[in-house]
UniProtKB/Swiss-Prot annotation:
This is Probable alpha-L-glutamate ligase. Binds 2 magnesium or manganese ions per subunit. Signal peptide: none annotated. The gene is rimK. Keywords: ATP-binding, Ligase, Magnesium, Manganese, Metal-binding, Nucleotide-binding, Protein biosynthesis.
Length: 458
């Protein structure tokens, strides 16, 4: 037996200075071969060509008050069998452990230990030739009270920084994008504009990455806000999905955006969930044009390109002959379109309800410009504050939920048979609604991310 060995109990307080961990309670288990430490939001990245990993650590069991953000070089990735017999592939890091007045380097596997009794497990490999375990004792190297632990972490919480949030978009000068960047910075976060077309992906089971033009790796952002223009839907959703695979929070998920961008599919989902929509028709062949027109109640009617946005690709056909001509012309171009009843009693007006996390934060009434039937702000429409009914509120909230969107612009038209859903937008513009209402919607979007990630200002 070596004279250098020291006695430890079945539980001890450890420290990892290189990780910024001044105190963490460990379960000492000589029956376990490897050691592990609690880690969530684990994200691999490269530093000077070497594999690294970042992770978050809540060092105090059953407490989320203290969050440490740690980084370490990866020394391995191994299949580890847990106490319940399940195998998990974990990142392995090496760091110097301090136990009492002793210090040496140990290997740690990273895993979520929320369901365990301790934030750390000290296994026999880390203790080999260093310690003797007395399982009948606890804290042989000294106990730490709650006050002492809080004081040790007091410096850490005081220095807590904001989140790093990426805005996935195409034009940094658009009002909505400028406001989101501004709102995030005002709340103490690091905001990064990421041009979707300049991002590219590395698909690799062991080290997936998102790169930015020039080679910068983007795996270290805490969250992303997708603001994907229609022409970039496929690539933008693929990019968002890749961030999600890295456990990076997306304000709106790729699945939700994809659902909402498919106008036909979204109407089918709304219909399936018993949410009222204008009567609409969809057909493949020009042979069915006459029946399609009759199906929606005849002319006047609306013809919509399924790929259109901001009022573009939407035509009012005032007569049956005009409707047939427009539909057949579009069909000859091999584009997909919807035919929809025209709600004449709306008189060129509709509602835009801005929904965040299942609540309406602002509503406006949009009025079409003279001689125009489309109320979109981008088509010259005007916006004014409006009070929405309980039925309209319920319809907007249910529509956003059906799409799976945490942030949505829900368009509703008032008809003689009640409110009808027109469209659900996953990247709603902010200028018209913020200008009309004076509400800080961009700030509410940032707040949604803060709540989801459990972040609070100092």
């Amino acid at each position: 037996m070596s004279d250098n060995k020291f006695i430890i109990g079945s539980e001890e307080w450890c420290a990892f200075p290189a990780l910024g961990v001044p105190a963490i309670k460990a379960r000492v288990d000589s029956g376990a071969r490897t050691s592990s430490i609690h880690a969530v939001n684990i994200r691999p990245f490269k530093r000077e060509g070497e594999p690294w990993v970042s992770f978050e650590l809540h060092p105090i069991q059953n407490s989320r008050k203290i969050i440490l953000r740690c980084e370490s070089k990866v020394v391995d990735r191994r299949n580890i069998k847990s106490s319940n017999g399940e195998s998990e592939k974990r990142y392995v890091i090496a760091s110097v452990i301090q136990l009492g007045g002793n210090a040496w380097e140990v290997e740690l596997t990273l895993t979520n230990r929320d369901s365990m009794g301790y934030r750390m497990l000290l296994g026999r490999e880390a203790m080999s030739n260093k310690t003797l375990v007395d399982p009948s004792e606890s804290f042989c190297l000294g106990e730490k009270g709650d006050l002492e632990v809080e004081q040790l972490y007091g410096v850490k919480t005081a220095k807590k920084s904001g989140l790093k949030i990426g805005l996935l978009a195409s034009n940094p000068d658009l009002y909505s994008n400028r406001r989101i960047i501004e709102a995030g910075e005002q709340r103490g976060h690091e905001m990064v504009f990421l041009n979707i077309s300049q991002c590219y992906l590395k698909l690799d089971a062991s080290s997936p990455e998102v790169h930015y033009r020039g080679g910068r790796v983007l795996n270290n952002v805490d969250a992303v806000i997708p603001r994907i223009r229609p022409s970039m839907t496929f690539y933008g959703c693929a990019l968002t999905r890749h961030f999600e695979s890295l456990n990076i929070e997306a304000l709106n998920t790729s699945d939700a955006i994809t659902r909402s961008r498919d106008k036909l599919f979204s109407l089918q989902l709304l219909q399936k969930n018993n949410l009222d929509i204008p009567t609409s028709g969809f057909a493949n062949s020009p042979v069915d044009t006459k029946d399609l027109i009759d199906m929606v109640g005849g002319a006047p009617l609306i013809v919509k390109l399924l790929e259109g946005t901001q009022g573009k690709g939407v035509v009012l056909a005032e007569t049956t002959k005009a409707a047939e001509s427009v539909i057949n012309a579009f069909k000859s171009l091999r584009v997909n379109l919807l035919v929809q009843e025209f709600i004449k009693e709306a008189q060129g007006k509709d509602l835009r309800c801005f929904v965040i996390d299942g609540k309406i934060v602002a509503s406006i009434e949009r009025t079409a410009a003279p001689g125009e039937f489309r109320a979109n702000i981008h088509m010259g429409g005007s916006a004014s504050i409006v009070s929405v009914s309980a039925a309209e509120k319920q319809l907007a909230i249910k529509a956003a939920k059906t799409m799976g969107l945490r942030v949505a612009g829900v368009d509703i038209i008032r008809s003689s048979r009640g409110p009808l859903l027109l469209e659900i937008n996953s990247s709603p513009g902010l200028e018209g609604i913020e200008s009309a209402t004076g509400i800080d919607i961009a700030g509410a979007m940032i707040e949604s991310i803060e709540k989801k990630l459990g972040w609070k200002a100092d």
